[in-house]
């Protein structure tokens, strides 16, 4: 299956790229610059493409991102600390981000005669991000079937959509993903902050997967209290 992977440079998408390279025909990586404050992740996507020996294309959609205001990922809004399941994490939503990126990716895939576009959406994203849920994925596929009818047959490949981030870590380890060469933190500092939702989720995932986490965090122990509070809330 000739596949283009949407790769942010994060743990999930880099692990997916390594999986595709091992199991299918990886045509290349596609990244998007939408004005995210953690733009350094794109450097990790470029490194992944070089490592796997495939082309890397960055699509500049900063002008679109400029109009998607109010998100902690693009605006001068504080990135909240804590677990992803907390209501405060909704400030990290960039409206329609995945829909926009996927539509562009499908156009690129059709032009390059790819069989699939792969995206690393996963079960842990469902609570906060509506465009990571199975219903969205299924509906987007139907829409693209109509949009490309008679021109190209491209599928949306999302092998992680119903699994946890811990499962992705395990899968990444299986396919020799160099986890130290991935970037998750939304704050875009020198090191992972260890406190934002994606850092907490990353740290927890390694713990649950039983895989050594090579990541350097500014606050390496914050995740313990953040995840404990979430579990306690679930029990109530």
Swiss-Prot record:
Q: Which cofactor does it need?
A: Zn(2+)
Q: Which gene encodes it?
A: queC
Q: Which NCBIfam families match?
A: 7-cyano-7-deazaguanine synthase QueC
Q: Which domain of life is it from?
A: Bacteria
Annotated EC: 6.3.4.20
Q: Does the keyword Hydrolase apply?
A: no
Give the catalysed reaction(s), semicolon-separated. Answer: 7-carboxy-7-deazaguanine + NH4(+) + ATP = 7-cyano-7-deazaguanine + ADP + phosphate + H2O + H(+)
> Which named protein is this?
7-cyano-7-deazaguanine synthase
